[in-house]
C-alpha cells in the first residue's frame, strides 16, 4: 500500500468530518476559540492556500482552506467560519470548512493534470464574437463544442453591430440564423450604442456567467458596461492568434456582480478552451444537429468525409445541416492533432 493512500476507515472519517462541517448550525469547537460560527458563503477568488469568501451580507473575508478540501475554485458554495478579533488587535483569517456539491464545474485541459477545474456552478458561457477583427464561425463552433462537452449552456453574443450597414446587417443575420435554427440563443448588441443591451442584461440576470471569445471582440467593453464603476477594470488576457482560444496566464479567476443582477466569473482559464484532449467522437457529439444522424451511416467506421452512404453528408446535401458547420467540424478535427501539446522530455531539452 502506498504511504499516501488512505485506508477505507480513514476515508470514512474524512467524509464524516466533511459532512459535519457542512452543518452551519453547529457551535465552534473549544480549540477553535478564534473562529466564529459556521455560515454559508461563496468563493469570490482563490489564491493558493487562501480564498476570498463573500458572506450572505455581502462582506468579503480572506480565509484559509482546510487541508481535507481537495478542490476549491471560484464560484464554489461553501461553509466557512470568520476569524475573530485577536487580543493584539489583528483579525484572524477565517477558514473554509466544507464545499457544497457543485451544479456544474468548468474545466480546461492541462498537459500534466489531465483536466483542471477553474470555476464552479456556472450557468452559462457567453460566447462573444464581433464583425471586427473578423466574424469567425469556426471560433464560435469551437466554443460550442466545448460548451456541449462541459454541459454548460451557451449564449452567443455578436458585438459591434453598430459598425454594420444595411447589407452587412442582412449578411450577419443570415450567419446567426444558422445557430438560431439549431436551438442556440443569439443576441446582436453594441456596447457603444447600447442596442440589444437590455435583452443581454435580462439573459444574464439571476445567473453566473463566464465570457469567452477572441481578442478584440469587445469582451472588456461589454463587461465594463454591465459592471458597477467600482468593478469595471476587468483584466483581458492575451489571446492566441493561432487558435483564438487563448494562452495560459496566472491571473486568478474572480467573481463580480452585475449592476442589474447576476454574476460573472472573469477567468483567464476560459481562454484555454483547447479541444486537443477530446476524442473525435466527442467533437462529433458536440455538433448538436449531427446527433439525429449518427449511427445511420452505411459503414460503422464512417469518417463523415467522402465515405459512401454517409448520413451526415446526405443531410448537408439536403440542406438539413448547414454546410458552414459541417466544414468547421472537419477543420476542428484536422487541427486537433496539430494543436495537441507535447510534454517536453529530457532529450528535447539537451
Swiss-Prot record:
Its main location: cytoplasm. Its EC number is 3.6.1.-. The keyword GTP-binding applies. Zn(2+) binds at residues 297, 302, 304, 310. Residues 103-273 form the CP-type G domain. One of its GO terms (cellular component) is cytoplasm. Its cofactor is Zn(2+). This is Small ribosomal subunit biogenesis GTPase RsgA. It comes from Yersinia pestis.
Amino acid at each position: 500500500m502506498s504511504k499516501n493512500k488512505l485506508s477505507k476507515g480513514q476515508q470514512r472519517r474524512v467524509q464524516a468530518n466533511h459532512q459535519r462541517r457542512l452543518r452551519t448550525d453547529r457551535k465552534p469547537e473549544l480549540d477553535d476559540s478564534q473562529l466564529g460560527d459556521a455560515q454559508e458563503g461563496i468563493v469570490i477568488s482563490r489564491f493558493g492556500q487562501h480564498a476570498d469568501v463573500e458572506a450572505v451580507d455581502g462582506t468579503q473575508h480572506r480565509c484559509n482552506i482546510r487541508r481535507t478540501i481537495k478542490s476549491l475554485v471560484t464560484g464554489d458554495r461553501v461553509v466557512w467560519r470568520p476569524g475573530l478579533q485577536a487580543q493584539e488587535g489583528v483579525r484572524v483569517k477565517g477558514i473554509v470548512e466544507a464545499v457544497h456539491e457543485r451544479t456544474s464545474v468548468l474545466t480546461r485541459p492541462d498537459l500534466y493534470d489531465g483536466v483542471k477545474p477553474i470555476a464552479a456552478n456556472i450557468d452559462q458561457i457567453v460566447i462573444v464574437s464581433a464583425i471586427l477583427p473578423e466574424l469567425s464561425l469556426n471560433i464560435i463552433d469551437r466554443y460550442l463544442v466545448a460548451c456541449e462537452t462541459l454541459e454548460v449552456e451557451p449564449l452567443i453574443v455578436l458585438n459591434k453591430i453598430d459598425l454594420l450597414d444595411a447589407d452587412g446587417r442582412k449578411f450577419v443575420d443570415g450567419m446567426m440564423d444558422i445557430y438560431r435554427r439549431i436551438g442556440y440563443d443569439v443576441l446582436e448588441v453594441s456596447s457603444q450604442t447600447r442596442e440589444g443591451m437590455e435583452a443581454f442584461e435580462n439573459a444574464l440576470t439571476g445567473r453566473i456567467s463566464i465570457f469567452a471569445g477572441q481578442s478584440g471582440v469587445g469582451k472588456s467593453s461589454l463587461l465594463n458596461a454591465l459592471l458597477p464603476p467600482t468593478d469595471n477594470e476587468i483584466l483581458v488576457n492575451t489571446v492566441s492568434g493561432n487558435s483564438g482560444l487563448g494562452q495560459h496566464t496566472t491571473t486568478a479567476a474572480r467573481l463580480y456582480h452585475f449592476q442589474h443582477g447576476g454574476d460573472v466569473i472573469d477567468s483567464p482559464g476560459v481562454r484555454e478552451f483547447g479541444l486537443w484532449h477530446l476524442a473525435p467522437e466527442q467533437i462529433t457529439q458536440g455538433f448538436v444537429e449531427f446527433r439525429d444522424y449518427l449511427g445511420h451511416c452505411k459503414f460503422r467506421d464512417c469518417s463523415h468525409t467522402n465515405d459512401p452512404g454517409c448520413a451526415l453528408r446526405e443531410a448537408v446535401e439536403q440542406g438539413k445541416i448547414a454546410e458552414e458547420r459541417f466544414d468547421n467540424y472537419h477543420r476542428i478535427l484536422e487541427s486537433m492533432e496539430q494543436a495537441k501539446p507535447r510534454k517536453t522530455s529530457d532529450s528535447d531539452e539537451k
